[in-house]
Amino acid sequence: MANRNVEKLASIDAQLRLLVPGKVSEDDKLVEYDALLLDKFLDILQDLHGEDLKEAVQQCYELSAEYEGKHDPKKLEELGSLLTSLDTGDSIVIAKAFSHMLNLANLAEELQIAYRRRIKLKSGDFADEANATTESDIEETFKRLVHKLNKSPEEVFDALKNQTVELVLTAHPTQSVRRSLLQKHGRIRNCLAQLYAKDITPDDKQELDEALHREIQAAFRTDEIRRTPPTPQDEMRAGMSYFHETIWKGVPKFLRRVDTALKNIGINERFPYNAPLIQFSSWMGGDRDGNPRVTPEVTRDVCLLARMMTSNMYFSQIEDLMIEMSMWRCNSELRVRAEELYRTARKDVKHYIEFWKRIPPNQPYRVILGDVRDKLYNTRERSRHLLVDGKSDIPDEAVYTNVEQLLEPLELCYRSLCDCGDHVIADGSLLDFLRQVSTFGLSLVKLDIRQESDRHTEVLDAITQHLGIGSYREWSEEKRQEWLLAELSGKRPLIGPDLPKTEEVKDCLDTFKVLAELPSDCFGAYIISMATSTSDVLAVELLQREYHIKHPLRVVPLFEKLADLEAAPAAMTRLFSMDWYRNRIDGKQEVMIGYSDSGKDAGRFSAAWQLYKTQEQIVKIAKEFGVKLVIFHGRGGTVGRGGGPTHLALLSQPPDTINGSLRVTVQGEVIEQSFGEEHLCFRTLQRFCAATLEHGMNPPISPRPEWRELMDQMAVVATEEYRSVVFKEPRFVEYFRLATPELEFGRMNIGSRPSKRKPSGGIESLRAIPWIFSWTQTRFHLPVWLGFGAAFKHAIQKDSKNLQMLQEMYKTWPFFRVTIDLVEMVFAKGNPGIAALNDKLLVSEDLRPFGESLRANYEETKNYLLKIAGHKDLLEGDPYLKQGIRLRDPYITTLNVCQAYTLKRIRDPNYHVTLRPHISKEYAAEPSKPADELIHLNPTSEYAPGLEDTLILTMKGIAAGMQNTG
């Protein structure tokens, strides 16, 4: 039996190597990393569940690998027979094992990317920027701008000082991996990285081997499934943990790299600490669009918790700074302040660890920083009191109420050190601290509020009806605007205590009350989703005025659907034409564009092109009115929701639309991929800043008129094709719900938000995330590619010369190239054979021809795509990405087959399966075995024991393997 196992392990390794598309490069370690983690895991699986269960995992892998090699549907049926013959406990273990192996494969790939990056940095050899696996390095970008594009170092420095990248973390429910597991994955990644370090000793290796074994086993023993949905407060705490763990220290570390990169192009001064190069905002606890769980109380709690956390992080660092600032020499300004503070200081403060006695005046910096420490302590305690009790006795003068109060003494210390010739000391930890304060302020992040436009209409309708002037809801757009402007120009209050309020109206008004009560630096933008007209913006301005919000939030319309994007330029023209509004915005406006809903509404092709045109148009209009426009990009993680490699997405934006100001969402699982580890955080900050700078200083070309004309024609055809299938095909919704796990999506408990805006309804009411998620699970990715094939076919059949034009567009126009490359990547991850299996098992016989026609469309679209890109095979220009996908495929295929058969058993209780006896012989004589315990983790399931957990585990595993949920 032992020899047989060695053979099995060898065969897995052999299959791995067969799947790799040739030797990628000399620095290719992916297969090595992957095989090491796999070997460790299989040993653990055998220890915990027996040799035979490990063999079942290997059998599944081999059948999947054979299918991936030959695409023989019989192999899927063999695999299905094997999986359905397992008892429920073993099924859970198999699903859990493959999900776990995919997470390990992701860790191996992350390490491979980091390893290759280090090699390239050492050698100075940077890959082609058009390649989807590489991104801009800040130093390389500076050098390219100066040496290849003839920009002066001063021009680069000035552009960088005037640049702002604002990353907005959202609680979109696409993070399917529990936080407990993410932390364990981080430790596995660290162990593996250290194992491959050059200077490792035999003892180190042994200890790291043990640690790796321990962490892999701990992850496997952790329940992957969230048993209850997270609350908005849970989501906010999870989001804030990234600041505590990586972003807080990552920002000053990154800014030091910026200093170094500037020095290397001849700029001999540091990047100013108060230049807002990187800013952070959040939607966690502020996004109430379709989420009834985000209440005014939640928003208040989230803001106070963030302020408490921020002052606590500053407080935990201030004593280290006091230890460092031991110098006695200072300028007269600081000496006078220190003596004044010394006279009024408390004698002993016993609750401090360091410097608890009165600090003598011959340590002037410590005296100043001691006062900062006292105020930070009080600021933290006051936030805690307000959070817990709703009130605090600590007075305003004892705390920091705005960031300028905290910066002032720190700047005084910095100036004094520089005046005394101690620049080198000033530019150490003190500069890092100043940069943190400038970036994070007192609130850590600025909380955006997002609300549906219809909620504001409801409130104003209640007001106008109460005032006896008619129904606001029924007024025309012109009448609404006229009334809103009249009220905004006047001073009469509109809301009295006797206003009749529904629950929804009260909730909306109470949100404005919270905005008025809390410090203004807690908040960022007020975003109106489903914005369609000028009155939507004026309505929020009026409600802010009504609640006397001291510093009103900037109001940001979010244009999402195709028709709204088309109407956006006219709406912005009308707004900018209003004298009252132009005075209010003071030359600055932000507009948000939604990638998710526009894609769901019209398909990826038409949405991408309309988003491009809308950006061009609204930027042009803003310029005409002398307004600086910031475009806020609401991008998801998946290609279907506007995702893709950051640097490529930015460099493909229309010229003159970023202009040094970028605001973009970082959603769900992308937060972990961007900030889960220190090196990931560093890479994320670098890629956003470098790509934004490059877009401004070396903008992409504008499309030629004939390209625009062709794109317009193709977009009409693509939209028609997409909508004819998704909205006009009478039985499409029925097919979609049968062929995918859409109905079961909510059981994953991955977000606080319901998956539908309205409990009943079809595709229109379904949120973009479960819409994309469902098709990602079946590896058919319909929302991404549907419409492309019809558009290309129409263009080429109309005029054969158009093929040449499309190929030229691909070679020379970044927007078009990126659009095609991202869809090509999705095709590389796709597998219509899995969709065919789902149809065979889950779809009624009369609907199967519909699925067949969609799969024929898939193949035709893929062929057109390859023709336009000039590729013989998918991803032929990106061997590393191709390798990573092909290594994962056999794991994902097992989970796809397991999911299809589990759905069959859930939906058809009469479906007959023949169970084989306990496959773990070690436990055959015992009344139960370790796998049986897993069934009892979900005692309340409405399905047969174990089926629901098996299904959820397959969903999570496939999401990990595709590296996308929704």
From Swiss-Prot:
Keywords, alphabetical: Allosteric enzyme, Carbon dioxide fixation, Cytoplasm, Lyase, Magnesium, Phosphoprotein, Photosynthesis
Cofactor annotation: Mg(2+)
GO biological process, alphabetically ordered: C4 photosynthesis; carbon fixation; leaf development; tricarboxylic acid cycle
Positions of L-aspartate binding: 641, 673, 829, 888, 964
Tissue spec: Expressed in mesophyll cells, but not in bundle-sheath, roots, stems and flowers.
Region forming the signal peptide: none
Chief site of localization: cytoplasm
EC id: 4.1.1.31
GO CC terms of this entry: apoplast; chloroplast; cytosol
Positions that bind D-glucose 6-phosphate: 283, 450, 597, 635, 665, 753, 767-769
Keyword Coiled coil recorded: no
Annotated control of activity: 5 fold activation by the allosteric regulator glucose-6-phosphate. Low sensitivity to inhibition by L-malate and L-aspartate. Up-regulated by light-reversible phosphorylation.
Residues recorded with modification Phosphoserine: 11
Class of this enzyme: lyase
Cited PANTHER family: PHOSPHOENOLPYRUVATE CARBOXYLASE, PHOSPHOENOLPYRUVATE CARBOXYLASE 3
More about this protein: Ser-774 is strongly involved in determining allosteric behavior of C4 PEPC.
Entry's family note: Belongs to the PEPCase type 1 family.
UniProt-recorded name of the protein: C4 phosphoenolpyruvate carboxylase
Originating organism: Flaveria trinervia
Lineage: Eukaryota, Viridiplantae, Streptophyta, Embryophyta, Tracheophyta
Name of the gene: PPCA
